[in-house]
Amino acid sequence: MNDASSDPGIPGRPGDVVAAAAPREVGALVFRPLEIDTWQEHVIYMHPDCPVCRAEGFSAQARVRVQIGDRSLIATLTLLGAPLLNTGEASLSLSAARTLSARAGDVVHVTHAPALESVRALRAKIYGCHLDSVQLDGIIGDISAGRYADVHIAAFLTACADGRMSLRETVDLTRAMVRSGQRLNWDREVVADKHCVGGLPGNRTTPVVVAIAAAAGLLLPKTSSRAITSPAGTADTMEALTRVTLDSTELRRVVEQVGAALVWGGALSLSPADDVLIRVERALDIDSDAQLVASILSKKIAAGSTHVLIDVPVGPTAKIREDSDLARLDLAMTKVADAFGLKLRILRTDGSQPVGRGVGPALEALDVLAVLQCQPTAPADLRERSLLLAGELLEFCGAIPPGQGRLLAGSLLDSGAAWARFQAICEAQGGLRTPGQAVFRRDVVAARSGIVTSVDNRHVARTAKLAGAPRRQVAGLELHVRAGDEVVAGAPLCTLHAQASGELEYAFSYALAHDPFRIE
């Protein structure tokens, strides 16, 4: 038996020869690592003729309980024959193997998964019924415990989309998601937070706002998500600059040391059900109002925030397209916030076009550094949006009298105080690093001369994602024009950045076919 890895969290390497040793117990199998990546979905692989499959009557896609030692999880069964597996062997997806700390040769016990009572509530929701708090607690509890397959999660997300959740259900969903994880307490009257609902490429204001607010003396333990349907989330961008995977003890140390943090919320078990939902949402490319509200506010509540500023960009190609959509979102967020005693302020901002130049984690990180360092070439729109939001947050939290927030924010940025605080945050989290650069680049040029009348947010975001963002940290695109700019034929409109030539060409072809820039 050959185990190529000394790390118990990385179960062997492809091609390892694992002897088909006889299991030590009846009804058990021997673990053989195959390193199959299912993107965090727990899957077990068994031979269709293995004695356990026959004895238990397992078939493909069955939900089964998998145990190695004292650790267990629920997984989806996939049948896999020779030569990859023998009848006495089983394998696990990478995420399942890591969860169970599986090593080559371990004894694997596989039994039927217990029936899930919450599936009845899920079916009811699919048919349009309203769910009560007990039913939603059951669904979210099973999701956070890993008992739902991705198909069940996708069904739940779809059943809750397109206005199918009432305000009462949204409150109960948020409460269930808060209960699914730990809840932080900072023992302070004011714990500030800022969030953008997304849908606008670039717009990486959060790191700048956090640095300014922390320099003004506000406590800001900022937890952020990774991208759901966008080319980058705040956590993705910050990861290009520093370590963002901190546990709650490390987070508390950083906040006590420098007054703020910028970390990935998924490492803290704050509303862990939301992290599972986000993973499936990413594949579905959907983001419903109820789920959006519950996702945002459950994590703010769990993080111990008391005052939350929500940036809502509104524009024809943004996530929120009309003021009527904003009004509906405002009502839902206010209702949920009131139920938890959370102070909330929603700020409507211009969502007509991207903000900043970079779209993608590393490229957005460069914009953040340029603004914080007050570089002459820093994107003016990102600077102004950041100062607007920072000033609003300072006033909302009582750090400055009304009407003076923008002035104080500008002073803290121009004096270098915000940059110094940002450096301190990054150093406390593990050190500040320089964002990487992509191997391949290609310009998308203007086909004609004229005025850029609009920039399509969705096509810009899609192009950046096809180039590899956020999966490849350095991938994305760099914008060279904004609406209102005059261009000549052949002038670069944006530059694509990619780590693979195939992704570069794919993104380039999409940009040519869908042209994010309208020129008249």
From Swiss-Prot:
Its EC number is 2.4.2.4. It is an enzyme of class 2 (transferase). Keywords: Glycosyltransferase, Transferase. One of its GO terms (molecular function) is thymidine phosphorylase activity. GO terms for cellular component: cytosol. One of its GO terms (biological process) is pyrimidine nucleoside metabolic process. It catalyses: thymidine + phosphate = 2-deoxy-alpha-D-ribose 1-phosphate + thymine. Belongs to the thymidine/pyrimidine-nucleoside phosphorylase family. Type 2 subfamily. This is Putative thymidine phosphorylase 1. It comes from Cupriavidus necator (strain ATCC 17699 / DSM 428 / KCTC 22496 / NCIMB 10442 / H16 / Stanier 337) (Ralstonia eutropha).
